[in-house]
UniProtKB/Swiss-Prot annotation:
It comes from Avian erythroblastosis virus (strain ES4). It holds the Pfam family zf-C4. PANTHER family: NUCLEAR HORMONE RECEPTOR, THYROID HORMONE RECEPTOR ALPHA. One of its GO terms (cellular component) is virion component. This is Gag polyprotein. Disulfide bonds: none annotated. The gene is gag. Belongs to the nuclear hormone receptor family. NR1 subfamily.
Length: 555
């Protein structure tokens, strides 16, 4: 049988506290309240002499230790009693835990007079267990005090086999003061910081100041993080005049004693060669950080440019395709590169006062509208000629050619006008010959689309596109496979991919030093597609208002 007991009980049962004691008898069982009140009254009725006699140490009877004597007469074995003697339990007769018979409150004795014979209970019969009548509690307290520190109550297991008892060790031990003692493994603290070790240092390099593990080259010396921070803090806050030493500056500075004397530690920092002038103040530290950030940004750009330089350039076939597209654009672009010298500004009084209303409700200046329709017809004709000069376009069915031209015509005309934006005069040159301002173009029939074209011109002016780049961008807009009603979608998509690949390789060849130039330029395709979608509805209104200006084929 196993049962949970305290270590004090285990100490008693194993004989660590002295002899053997008797188990508690029937008198130890808690009495009812009425009986306790009667016993209390009887005890109060005792005379003072009787109580003093009980407490006198010199008259105290020696506790009996029961051996193999008879339980009735107390003689040695072999008496004439009817009941044969039997050995008592192993815990009977201990001086540490006496019989509770005759022990009153707080162990001061009961009603039985000192020296009186205590009745003994035979084995197997109910009655009072054998044991001493009275216990010397003063001696027991003295023995317990001399044996060592108080025993900590802890659970044990009493077993019938194997070791007599086994302590159940908890995760942490609770001491008498209520505090916990943690495991030693949880209290381990690293004596030094590992830190980042540069590759230029040996793995076991030591600090020249305290001998701890070094983390780098600080202020012209190989030091640890602690000595580096101590030296920097001392110089920045000017603390060294306040340092003092109680041993006349003769302290030995090592990893253990470095925090005990600041003066000797600072003197050793100076003696090993740490430079005070290398400690930066706030302004110098900010300037240094700014310089570091600038160097990082410069290296990042250099690495980006270096990576762009290794991108593929156009192949021989792509160069031939690029040449054909460029020539097609130059032959159909009015005025060419001399458009600034040959342009004519629209009179300022034209397009400033819209009068007539179009079907969508916008006000239109009829004079400006008439001027714009005059240059629209040759502009559309040049876009058609550009498409016919492309070898891949002529191989498509006639139905697909018409759909592609209707979809891209306004986009290409807007692109050609946007690349001729003049930031000085804030004008766009239409068809290479007429320079107009924002309000004139808006009141001439384009409405809010004019704002989008002018904004596109401002953004494209920063790209500084050449004729080849404009020509390839027009070819990409022309070969859009997402137009509604196309028959040879796969063939058109393949043509657009070939133009895009040649365009990208050309950008890598010419603009490799500009980060993200290719991706930013492709974003302008979406802007042009949006302008073209809104343009189509505007030209339908122009056809209704001026049916004689545009032929059905041109619309």
């Amino acid at each position: 049988r196993e049962e949970q007991v305290t270590s004090e009980q285990a100490k008693f049962w194993l004989g660590l506290g002295g002899g053997r004691v008797s188990p508690p008898g029937p008198e130890c069982i808690e009495k009812p309240a009425t009986e306790r009140r009667i016993d209390k009254g009887e005890e109060m009725g005792e005379t003072t002499v009787q109580r003093d006699a009980k407490m006198a140490p010199e008259k105290m009877a020696t506790p009996k230790t029961v051996g193999t004597s008879c339980y009735q007469c107390g003689t040695a074995t072999g008496c004439n009693c009817v009941t044969a003697s039997a050995p008592p339990p192993p815990y009977v007769g201990s001086g540490l835990y006496p019989s509770l018979a005759g022990a009153g409150e707080q162990g001061q004795g009961g009603d039985t007079p000192r020296g009186a014979e205590q009745p003994r209970a035979e084995p197997g019969h109910a009655g009072q267990a054998p044991g001493p009548a009275l216990t010397d509690w003063a001696r027991i307290r003295e023995e317990l005090a001399s044996t060592g520190p108080p025993v900590v109550a802890m659970p044990v297991v009493i077993k019938t086999e194997g070791p007599a008892w086994t302590p159940l060790e908890p995760e942490d031990t609770r001491w008498l003061d209520g505090k916990h003692k943690r495991k030693s493994s949880q209290c381990l603290v690293k004596s030094s910081m590992s830190g980042y070790i540069p590759s230029c240092l040996d793995k076991d390099e030591q600090c020249v100041v305290c001998g701890d593990k070094a983390t780098g080259y600080h202020y012209r010396c190989i030091t640890c993080e602690g000595c580096k921070s101590f030296f920097r803090r001392t110089i920045q806050k000017n603390l060294h005049p306040t340092y003092s030493c109680t041993y006349d500056g003769c302290c030995v500075i090592d990893k253990i004693t470095r925090n005990q004397c600041q003066l000797c530690r600072f003197k050793k920092c100076i003696s090993v060669g740490m430079a005070m002038d290398l400690v930066l103040d706030d302004s110098k530290r900010v300037a240094k950080r700014k310089l570091i950030e600038e160097n990082r940004e410069r290296r990042r750009k250099e690495e980006m440019i270096k990576s762009l330089q290794h991108r593929p350039s156009p192949s021989a076939e792509e160069w031939e395709l690029i040449h054909v597209v460029t020539e097609a654009h130059r032959s159909t672009n009015a005025q060419g590169s001399h458009w600034k010298q040959r342009r004519k500004f629209l009179l300022e009084d034209i397009g400033q006062s819209p009068m007539a209303s179009m079907l969508d409700g916008d006000k239109v200046d009829l004079e400006a509208f008439s001027e714009f329709t005059k240059i629209i017809t040759p502009a559309i004709t040049r876009v058609v000629d550009f498409a016919k000069n492309l070898p891949m376009f002529s191989e498509l069915p006639c139905e697909d050619q018409i759909i592609l031209l209707k979809g891209c015509c306004m986009e290409i005309m807007s692109l050609r006008a946007a690349v001729r934006y003049d930031p000085e005069s804030e004008t766009l040159t239409l068809s290479g010959e007429m320079a107009v301002k924002r309000e004139q173009l808006k009141n001439g029939g384009l409405g809010v689309v004019s704002d989008a074209i002018f904004d596109l011109g401002k953004s494209l002016s920063a790209f500084n596109l050449d004729d080849t780049e404009v020509a390839l961008l027009q070819a990409v807009l022309l070969m859009s496979s997402d137009r509604t009603g196309l028959i040879c979608v796969d063939k058109i998509e393949k043509c657009q991919e070939s133009y895009l690949l040649a365009f990208e390789h050309y950008i890598n060849y010419r603009k490799h030093n500009i980060p993200h130039f290719w991706s930013k330029l492709l974003m302008k395709v979406a802007d042009l597609r949006m302008i073209g979608a809104y343009h189509a509805s505007r030209f339908l209104h122009m056809k209704v208002e001026c049916p004689t200006e545009l032929s059905p084929q041109e619309v």
